[in-house]
Amino acid sequence: MRVWELETYGALFDRTPEGKISQRNFGGHEYPRLAHVGDRTGLELIRTLQQKVTSLQQDDKKATGDAESGIKVFAETTMIRLLMRDGRVGGAFGYQRATGDFFSFTAAAVIIATGGLGKTFKVTSNSWESTGDGLALALRAGATAINMEFVQFHPTGMMWPPSVRGVLVTESVRGDGGVLRNSEGKRFMFNYVPEVFRDQYATTEEEGDRWYTDPDNNKRPPELLPRDEVARAINAEVKAGRGSPHGGVFLDIGSRRSEEFIRRRLPSMYHQFKQLADVDITKEPMEVGPTGHYAMGGLEVDPDTQATNIPGMFCAGEASGGLHGSNRLGGNSLSDLAVFGKRAGDAAVAFVDEHGHQTPKFSDDELQA
């Protein structure tokens, strides 16, 4: 339902020759089920939702004469405190980064959608903003957290040059035929298939390679094991002295797929390595290694409404906890955002309708406290 909704907003999902939405394999998936836009699905969803906001503002402009009468976007803004009144959230206090000017929002309901905490690790795929600030604000206000000990390290982040260490190398590379090799040129993942996965994953290169063209009659290549298994295997190879020059391993797709295939299926990865590392992935392997990627923990929420234990406070996306267990499957973060973001929004509206639209007033002394 949410994928269809995103298409009505303008998202351009890849299609099969039969006209159906294309679905690809990611690590840990038993079946290909990830709807995608090349290798840049997340960027396409951001573009689509930004475009939808602009469209709604244009509609408001026609209806009221004010494009910001319904939706107002505050860019480059940092929240530093949630405002509370009688045990219920009543807004937020923050500042504009460009000017340093302080200001406050009052609201009958607040949704925390501030993402994760990956930037607390030295090597991470996350942006500089992912420092867990939203979680800290909610915890100070009295919200409870869950599963904070579970942080996923994606197995493939860039290793060189130092300025881009940790930048994500999408799992799509392995889903489309890329394999992991150590410094000896060996596909080492066959040595790291846990007993629990033996019946599902190939034990020879020949069978693993056949899976790409005949998945119904062959076992999956071990490069597509769940992310924690692949990250541990890479770390073991590096510790055993079989790593790449900069402390990772090699991800090779150039020797296995044509240049046309790679540039068509993985355009973002091709340009990312060409521009940031001067590596042509159609001709040479990529250096990759584990990178801090996703926090499974977050605010404890009701699974149907995304409500926290604080009246009027809701949470969605990576800032919420409990949905992904201890190890999220690849692709499920975007599914999480689309499904539970909608639930959080609907529940916040229902809360306000039930408890009233009136927002509390805060004095200057309260804001400065």
Question: Residues of each region from the PLM?
Answer:
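Active-site and channel-lining beta-strand-loop segments
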Residues: 12, 177-190, 291, 297-307
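Glycine-/small-residue-rich beta->alpha transition segments that form the dinucleotide
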Residues: 98, 107-109, 113-118, 277, ...
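An anion/pyrophosphate-binding glycine-rich loop and adjacent beta-alpha core
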Residues: 144-275, 347-353
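Long, amphipathic alpha-helical stalk/connector segments used for oligomerization, subunit docking
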Residues: 351-369
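Glycine-rich loop(s) and the adjacent beta-strand/alpha-helix scaffold that form part
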Residues: 109-167, 199, 327-347
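A glycine-rich dinucleotide-binding beta-alpha-beta segment and adjacent secondary-structure elements
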Residues: 70-75, 80-90, 95, 264-320
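Core beta-strand elements of the Rossmann-like FAD/NAD(P) dinucleotide-binding domain
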Residues: 98-109, 308-312
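Conserved redox-cofactor binding core of oxidoreductases
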Residues: 2-101, 113, 157-161, 166, ...
